UniProtKB/Swiss-Prot annotation:
UniProt motif (Q motif) ranges: 28-56
Limits of the Helicase ATP-binding domain: 59-229
GO terms for cellular component: cytoplasmic stress granule
SMART domains the record matches: DEXDc, HELICc
Top-rank taxon, per record: Eukaryota
Gene responsible for this protein: TIF1
Subunit note: Component of the eIF4F complex, which composition varies with external and internal environmental conditions. It is composed of at least eIF4A, eIF4E and eIF4G.
Enzyme class: hydrolase
Gene Ontology MF terms: ATP binding; ATP hydrolysis activity; RNA binding; RNA helicase activity; translation initiation factor activity
Official protein name in the record: ATP-dependent RNA helicase eIF4A
SUPFAM superfamilies given in the database record: P-loop containing nucleoside triphosphate hydrolases (SSF52540)
Binding residues for ATP: 72-79
Known function: ATP-dependent RNA helicase which is a subunit of the eIF4F complex involved in cap recognition and is required for mRNA binding to ribosome. In the current model of translation initiation, eIF4A unwinds RNA secondary structures in the 5'-UTR of mRNAs which is necessary to allow efficient binding of the small ribosomal subunit, and subsequent scanning for the initiator codon.
Length: 401
């Protein structure tokens, strides 16, 4: 893989033809995957009818115990891919932690926990979310009960292993979700330390939207002959998402543009992304002053506060959420029909994580980008990177949402 790494170190998005998929077997329905009956019931009760492309390819090899690297965009069913595989592999009669899943944010870890519990509803599965912002004593007590599956953020998980609360001797599966995000946000050391503390034969499953150099390093150091299921760059589509831009010229005109849009469009649910926490607070205040109902969420807020806001947003009692990139990957709300990039993301990779929120699993969505004169270059870069066309917003945008 050395030439791949060279390309990666030059800061290039790695082309699909440099690291080819080495697994092409497709199983296109859940009934043919030889899954436990209770797990199948959970899958259908959750609302899945047939597996997504990544599920059709990855579940079977993961269930057989192979190490696996899966590259797929946000919103393609990655969480269910490893959740189903873990639930199939673990033995729920054994009261020990058998699978460990890491995620970059608390919100994503809690989201994964919810999916695991829902899919494992008929299996009596015990799944614990081990995240910062919660009482250490409670965490230790829960981990001493030996939950079958632990989902957590790297810092807290490492701490719990060190304290002897999270016992790893029975761990047979280690899964890294959104690996690119975790490794780029300073968790690398904790993740490497955790690897050293797991049994040598632990199966490793890694999921990532992009194959950054840090991700490739992990695959080389810790994975044995992995199956690679890779979506080529030009296949990282934004399928089903209608993308538009509004030319606002000046930064200070964005607010009025947003207010106009708010009045034209009936929004079921929308997420508005800003570049900084301060901007989130400012915009929320501006909209409140104009009698618009919106909620806001960012990393400076207390954990309990963030949970209340997410609950309101999920239940639909709050319809518009203003947030930052940090939380883009933890928002999984089925009804999100509109994403507004008040500020374009500072990195091209984050674009897919933001607008992948709308239209998940084939549901249609609309993304509207506010573009000032300074943003034009970034928009062009995004179009080139994703091989996509962002059109000027039509007057009848209300009919499309």
């Amino acid at each position: 893989m050395s030439d791949t790494k060279g390309a990666a170190e030059q800061g290039l998005q790695i082309d699909g033809d440099l690291i080819n998929s080495n697994w092409n077997e497709v199983v296109d329905n859940f009934d043919d995957m030889k899954l436990k009956g209770e797990l199948l019931r959970g899958i259908y009760a959750y609302g899945f009818e047939r597996p997504s492309a990544i599920q059709q390819r990855a579940i079977m090899p993961i269930v057989t115990g192979r190490d696996c690297i899966a590259q797929a965009q946000s919103g393609t069913g990655k969480t269910a891919t490893f959740s189903v595989s873990i639930l199939q592999r673990i033995d729920t009669t054994v009261k020990k932690t058998q699978a460990l899943v890491l995620a970059p944010t608390r919100e994503l870890a809690q989201q994964i926990q919810k999916v695991v519990i829902a899919l494992g509803d008929y299996l009596n599965v015990d799944c614990h979310a081990c995240v910062g912002g919660t009482a250490v004593r409670e965490d230790i007590a829960r981990l001493n009960e030996g939950p079958h599956i632990v989902v957590g953020t790297p810092g807290r998980v490492f701490d719990m292993i060190n304290r002897g609360a999270l016992k790893t001797e029975a761990v047979m599966m280690f899964c890294l979700d959104e690996a690119d995000e975790m490794l780029s946000t300073g968790f690398k050391e904790s993740i490497y330390e955790i690897f050293q503390l797991l049994p040598g034969e632990t199966q490793v499953v890694l999921l990532s939207a992009t194959m950054a150099p840090e991700v490739l390093d992990v695959t080389k150091k810790f994975m044995r002959d992995p199956i690679r299921i890779l979506v080529k760059k030009d296949e990282l589509t934004l399928e089903g998402i209608r993308q538009f831009y509004i030319n606002v010229e000046k930064e200070e005109w964005k607010l009025e543009t947003l207010c106009d849009l708010y009045e034209t469009v009936t929004i079921t649910q929308a997420v508005i992304f800003c570049s900084t926490r301060r901007k989130v607070d400012w915009l929320t205040q501006q909209l409140h002053d104009r009698q618009f109902t919106v909620s806001a969420m960012h990393g400076d807020m207390k954990q309990e506060e963030r949970e209340v806001i997410m609950k309101e947003f999920r239940s639909g009692s709050s319809r518009v959420l203003i947030t930052t990139d940090l939380l883009a990957r933890g928002i999984d709300v089925q009804q999100v029909s509109l994403v507004i990039n008040y500020d374009l993301p500072s990195s091209k990779e984050n674009y897919i994580h933001r607008i992948g929120r709308g239209g998940r699993f084939g549901r249609k969505g609309v993304a509207i980008n506010f573009v000032s004169n300074e943003d034009k270059n970034m928009l062009e870069e995004i179009e080139t990177y994703y091989n996509t066309q962002v059109e000027e917003m039509p007057l009848n945008v209300a009919d499309l949402i």
